[in-house]
Amino acid sequence: MESSSAGVSAARKNGLTERNTVPARRSKVKSFDLADRWFNRLGRFAGAMHEGFWLGWLNADELNAVTAEHFDQSKYYASPGHNLSGFFGWEKSVLERFFQRGSRILVAGAGGGREVLALRKAGFDAEGFECSVPLVRASEQIFERLGESKYVTLCEPDRVPQGPRIYDGLVVGWTVYTHIPTKARRVAFLQGLSERALPGSPLLVSYFARQSGVSDDVLVHRTARFWRFLLRGRQEPLEVGDRISYARFVRSFTSDEVEAELRDAGFRSAHHGADGELGYTVGIGE
């Protein structure tokens, strides 16, 4: 009996302890949730101030220099592992649908040669151009090891090498379009590509996609406008979706925005698709 009574007493004591512990635990959890929300808000605000300051102050050429520094130092984009990896799944399906095998393709922003190599392996006559000297050199080393000619040439940022209309299709390298600052430069870039292609040629563009009215994009945009006014910074217009991410300029788009820029450059939109946060569009030259 004594043992039974002691057990009941201990159980009651443990129950009281548990009941006293639960409110304290709940209080700590609530405190954590509150602190975490405010920490994240402060982080977003600090990030918006940082991105907005530089977006409002740096002009398009300076943003290009920031982006170039990122890609010039990239070991990933220069690596044989990346450049010999072939097409992404979405690239393969789009190319099979809109591009005729055996046709002549120009790749803009060809990097270390991934798209050019994959296209040539798939039976296309492909060549490209790139503005990063280290990436062009990396492509030359890869082509040399494969016993191939050097199919990637150097070109200035946001420019297209001049020449005759000889290409049957155009490919803007993986997310290259998303790193070109200002709508005017992007449209001029597309027009330059159009001038190298035969009428009716397909164009593939990939980019970072966004939904309209994303709060972080709006916050960064407003902050950039404030700093531009305060510092009398860049003269080019600022756009919602302009960001600085991983030490490079990044522009994210809605499909409607991409379609409008293609139309301004003389392409009609033929197909939209998405792969996670990546969007891609096929335009047809008119």
Where are these regions (language model features)?
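Conserved class I S-adenosyl-L-methionine
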Residues: 25-100, 102-111
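Class I SAM-dependent methyltransferase SAM/SAH-binding core
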Residues: 112-159
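A short glycine-rich, Lys/Arg-flanked "PGG" loop and its adjoining helix->strand segment in the class I
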Residues: 187-199
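A short SAM/SAH-binding and catalytic strip from SAM-dependent methyltransferases
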Residues: 169-184
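SAM-dependent methyltransferase
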Residues: 205-261
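Core SAM-dependent methyltransferase catalytic element
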Residues: 271-286
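A short acidic, Gly/Pro-enriched loop at the edge of an enzyme's catalytic core
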Residues: 161-170
